[in-house]
Amino acid sequence: MDVAESPELDPHSPEDEEQPALSDDDILRESGSEQDLDGAGERASDLEEEENATRVQSQEETRSDEEDRASEPKSQDQDSEAHELSRGPAGSPCEEGDDVEEDGTSDLRDEASSVTRELDEHELDYDEEVPEEPAPAAQEEEAEKAGAEEEEEKGEGAPGEEGKPDVQSVGEQEPTEAAKEKKKEDDDGEIDDGEIDDDDLEEGEVKDPSDRKVRPRPTCRFFMKGNCTWGMSCRFIHPGVNDKGNYSLITKAEPFPPNGAPPLGPHPLMPANPWGGPVVDEILPPPPPEPPTESAWERGLRHAKEVLKKATIRKEQEPDFEEKRFTVTIGEDDREFDKENEVFRDWNSRVPRDVRDTTLEPYADPYYDYEIERFWRGGQYENFRVQYTEAEPYHNYRERERERERENRQRERERERERDRERERRQRERERERERERDKERQRRKEEWERERAKRDEKDRQHRDRDRDKDREKDKEKPKPRSPQPPSRQAEPPKKESTSVGPQVKRADEWKDPWRRSKSPKKKLGVSVSPSRARRRRKTSASSASASNSSRSSSRSSSYSGSGSSRSRSRSSSYSSYSSRSSRHSSFSGSRSRSRSFSSSPSPSPTPSPHRPPVRTKGEPAPPPGKAGEKSIKKPAPPPAPPQATKTTAPGPEPAKPGDLREARRKERQTRTPPRRRTLSGSGSGSGSSYSGSSSRSRSLSVSSVSSVSSATSSSSSVHSVDSDDMYADLASPVSSASSRSPTPAQTKKERGKSKKEDGVREEKRRRDPSAQPPKSSKAPAGGKASQQAAAPQPAVPGQPQQGSFVAHKEIKLTLLNKAADKGSRKRYEPSDKDRQSPPAKKANLSPDRGSRDRKSGGRMGSPKPERQRGQNAKAPAAPADRKRPLSPQSKGSSKVTSVPGKATDTATAGTKSGKASTLSRREELLKQLKAVEDAIARKRAKIPGKV
């Protein structure tokens, strides 16, 4: 125990110099810095004082230091123990050198005891460290360090107080140890090995973060000396080694920058450390502190960057990249969902290349390279071995990878392009197939419709002929026969058919109007009005069709014909807007050509009228006066018809003179016109009215012939429907629609052809019938004029009948109007003239029969027999029934009765009777009409494509 030993262990001067930084003391001490201990005694006392100060400082420091050092207490304790042990022996020499060796021995004894005490405490530390209060732990550690040094100092410095040293050193050591013990008790739970020190935390309990995180972790002084036995598990920072983990994120306020040069300084000293060996083993001298390769973190970053780069390159290179991103195809989807395995997908291509390249690259062991590349490239699995293996080869690898990636990308792009092309091709083919199928469908439908139309046309022709014959007979018989007439008319329809057939062949009707407008220029020999009538007819037809479209969505065909009509007839479109409009339009178109005055008056009023009419009709059924009665009361029309009938009746039999007919018509029109004026604007002049009536009638008739035939029927069947229904009933009502449409193209043509005159008469008659003129129809003169007047009023009525119909069945009125319009359209060329002039006489003769027949045939067209009856009923009863019972279908009987010009009452009664009887038959007829309408629609559709 010579002083020689003491100098090596003597910490005095180092401590004096580096009390703030004890780690340096340790380092100096360990490095064997020797300092004379001659004044050690005095120094010792000073040092002890200093050490006390230091202890306080160090304690404060530790308090401010991180708690995270929990693991260090052990290392420090160990270190301090080691120091004390080594110092213990050395201490005595110091003391000896100073004065008293006994003191030294006592000091040694004391030191030994203190050491044992310390060891005990340390042992406790090892076993019981609980992470209770990191700060105290840190303090404790530093305190321990300080204590160890102080103890050493005390051991060595005791001589300064010669006699007291033992006591003093022991006393001081004890206080130090007491402090340490206190600290250790605090620390007892300090965790070693960097465990989390919240073992004693209750669930959810959190330590005050200010304690742990605010305080930077101090560097480990013992590690700096190379003494730290804790290695990686040390709580304190070992600059190059354990400062990389989670702890590195905590800001360090230590004197040494964690990665700064100072930390590196101590390493050379490490080997000198007796304790260095184990430390080195544990630490594995921070394997080149940062293997030049990358940490997982860096690798992830790099991978992300690469992916980004690749993506941008792809965007630049692939024009369709954006589209591809959005196009979802199975192939691409698979790729999307398969992303995690994408890295391996190309491995097959990659591996062989790797093997091929192996010779060129020293590190390219195909297997390991493959592995590295795979893991590195994919960045899927973190293969940390890569760090060590990859450092060099990685760059070659990268280049090779880049090439490979480029190739793969190109290949992918090509594949994608191929796929896109395939997809487009397939789509195009699919579309083509669909087109082909659609065309086939269209063809099939067209053919079916054509076939159906042909069949229906035949039936319609027969029905029409039968209806015409019956109508004629019943017209002759007058209303009474007429009510029964439906059968006779049905029987007669053959005549009609023959008539229609003959005219059809001769007439321009042969041309099937895509809109199913009946062209009956030949029908009415008087062609003067025919152009306007034709126009009106078209318009009316269009309006009927359009109206039926608007009023009935059920009739698709009507939409076709309607739209077609609307195209061809500007009015049609308005017409289609609604029955009221359609009435207005029919009035307009009829009026236009014939007498605008009438047109204007009916038009405006009818429009409101159609909606009003229901009221008016009910009220106005009384106003049977001429057109007003008819118009406003197409349902009430029978009463107007009776006045007309009276006039017509006056003209007498069918053979009534054309002039008479015209006069009667004019009178009727005038008569009606007042009502019309009431209902409408009342802007029809007698002649204007008659003309307007004629033209309107022609138009209505023309629609009527096509529409009206079905319309008359429809009117009876449609009585329940609104005017628009009637109007459109021809087109829309199953029966009327069928008759007006499916038959209409054929019927219109056939009817127009067969008996365009008849149709005109019939339609006029129908108008008359609705206006109670069908009976007059029987009387040729009155019938003709009445028909015309009725027709004219009906054109006006198209508005008003709608009114009346609206009251009873707007549709019925409309139907009547449409019928009138049909007549008008059929007559446009001839019928209006016929109605107005000699043709009216002919019409008068034919009109009753034809009107009845037309109505019936219209009905028959859709549902021949019911419709004929309806047609008849609809004609007269439509008005009376409309007046009296808007809902009751125009009774067939009533229609016939109504036909009786003079029997408005009869008509009304008949209408009532018919209404009752009709309701059932009407329902049936309506159903039939519906079917007919659909059929007609189908036919029309089939026809329209062919025609158009």
Swiss-Prot record:
The keyword Zinc-finger applies. There is a cross-link at K506, K618, K657, K813, K903 (Glycyl lysine isopeptide (Lys-Gly) (interchain with G-Cter in SUMO2)). SUPFAM superfamilies: CCCH zinc finger. Residues 1-219, 272-296, 388-922 are annotated as: Disordered. Its main location: nucleus. It comes from the Eukaryota. GO terms for cellular component: nucleus. Residues 603-612 have a biased composition (Pro residues). Residues 541-602, 688-721, 732-746, 774-804, 902-919 have a biased composition (Low complexity). Interacts with ZFC3H1 in a RNase-insensitive manner. This is Zinc finger CCCH domain-containing protein 18. It comes from Mus musculus (Mouse).
